[in-house]
Amino acid sequence: MNLRTIRAELQQFLQLAIPLAAAQVAQAAVGFVDTVMMGRLGPEPLAAGGLASALFQFILATASGVVMAVSPLVAEAQGAGKDYKIAAIARQGLWLSVLLGLPVMLIISQLARLMPVLGQSATTIALARDYWMAVLWGIIPGLGFAMLRGYVAALEQARIILPLVLFGTLVNGLGNYLLGYGQLGFPRLELTGLGLSSALGLWVMFLGLLAYTAWQPKLRRYPFWQDWRRLQPSICRQILQLGWAIAVTVAVEFGLFTIITILMGAIGVEALAAHQTVSQTIILIFMVPLGCSFAVTVRVGWWLGRQDGLGARRAGLVGVGAIALWMLLLAIPLALFPRAIVGIYVDLNNPVNAGLLNLALPMLRVASLALVLDGVQRVAMGALHGLQDTRIPLLLSLLAFWMVGVGSSAMLGFQLGWGSTGLWIGQSLGVAIAGGLFLQRFLKLTQNRTFKQRLQPQPLATHP
């Protein structure tokens, strides 16, 4: 690698990463807006809504992992000059979004039955159920949008995603105001209204991106809608073979944070509410490396199609370096102004929130120390997805997030009595271990000029 090739790769990366990262931040603003409005409803709706939203996002992110396999497959096909495969992959990805969405909706509708086993209060369960029964109607469009986002990103047509997400977020925020608070003659539905608004925002984004694939001239060259009624099991199997491991890896990663949320609820409503204010802030920040990881997946997948190991290595390291610097810059204000951040969610002058503030401040300090490591692990994982390397990273995720992260969280939080701060320290240790393992795996796989035969992607069973 030399400075010229690094600069060229950085330019390609930023052209793709900036709109994707901005879109992810805007999409996370849906949860941010929901959390702020939950906080204005009171501590109990904030705690219950935070738990309900966290579990919903966990399930949606896990299921989206299956259809996220479309992105590296399309990027590899384009890099190899096999354009005839591209539309077929996307069509079957859309089919899988619908077929997968139906059982996922059923799972969400039954979540409230599990909550007593997890130590949640009756009030928290009742409020959370209201949110779940409304927001579950956003599952199918959420999966469809995730698939189409990967499709257009792999074809370097990602700029449309940001305005679509911004419009969907606007729809969600307006719906929250009207339905959550009962403004302008609408009924006051509180958490039910917030859930319905989130689902509506997902439908707006999905339908907008679906229409864009049929209208945009550079995308129309790929016959996306040709034979769209035809289900092709061979291509679906190809997506599932790659996507199931991505989905489980996402579940393992997000499962750590979901378990921490559940453990916070076992400590108490106040700890859960404090955790929600901190975690929502971190989620918003984390959307930048998440969007950048999609860009790295595309860039590495393109080099995979060209069978160039050094090119893939350069693409991955450029992405990791860029996100590490960005997260370092964001960690500084997080560490210096924690009270101001908590004040976004709750009224600091209200004595009822004093306990929440005392719990949230040390959590934010721990979170600021872990930001860089969190960004590195996510982008390094995206680079591995670009290589279509998923099964070993899944095992590494289990080791880092569950054995180290969950294990140390339980020990520090409960056995040593460190409470909510101990839970945050434990999950940060899991993130740190994951970042090191993923980066080492990526460097090992890209150490040669050409990829080893075992890394060569399997040919898709489709024809021109």
Curated annotation (Swiss-Prot):
Pfam families: MatE. The keyword Cell membrane applies. It is a multi-pass membrane protein. One of its GO terms (molecular function) is xenobiotic transmembrane transporter activity. GO terms for biological process: monoatomic ion transport. One of its GO terms (cellular component) is plasma membrane. The chain crosses the membrane at residues 13-32, 52-74, 94-116, 131-153, 160-182, 192-214, 244-266, 281-303, 315-337, 352-373, 394-416, 421-443. Belongs to the multi antimicrobial extrusion (MATE) (TC 2.A.66.1) family. Multidrug efflux pump. This is Probable multidrug resistance protein NorM. It comes from Synechococcus sp. (strain ATCC 27144 / PCC 6301 / SAUG 1402/1).
